[in-house]
Amino acid sequence: DRSSAASDVYKRQTLDILREMKYYQNAWTNQYDIWFSIYSTPSESLTDRFCRLDKERFGEIPDITDKGYYQNSFHYDVRKDVTPFEKLDFEKDYPYYASGGFIHYCEYPKLNHNIKALEAVWDYSYDKVGYLGTNIPIDHCYKCDYDGDFETTENGYKCPNCGNSDPKTVDVVKRTCGYLGNPVQRPVIEGRQKEICARVKHMKEPRS
């Protein structure tokens, strides 16, 4: 369910789970005198693997196993058409329990024309989150000199201007986990590619 009410319910449930995990983290730290922590993992393979295993066991469940991937960490559903502010408001309560590491990010179109929009998000996030990534398209085609956002499919990437998809003459950069990667030169696992395909921008393209 992708409704706002359902999101609130699931958020409360997942925060309850994290509080329980935090309790054991602290207990084990005191018991063994070794620091334990909760890491909001961007595990590349588990995005794909856990979904496949659950589909084999439980079948195809709408909005869960039918997507072909699981959402990383505490990130808001990448399919949701929300603003950067709404996304950060949803995620901001989770890092308190994730002392081992976390990241927030928002997806944008090219914003060369509107730097103040980015600054507004950064200002808003300043006292709400501890680590914020800004995903702006910087893909480049060396065949037609296009700069921007390549078309993303489950089979790869191509220049929207000339259709070029030759790995030797394109440069594509995507946030594949907590890091930036080039999925043309180093293809990602199938579930991750499906997740990238499902992403929506959290800010709209300007009207021409």
Model-found features: residue ranges?
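Single conserved hydrophobic/aromatic residue that forms the stacking wall/gate
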Residues: 1-6, 10-13
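Short acidic, low-complexity intrinsically disordered linear motifs used
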Residues: 168-183
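Secondary-structure transition/capping motifs at alpha-helix termini
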Residues: 19-35
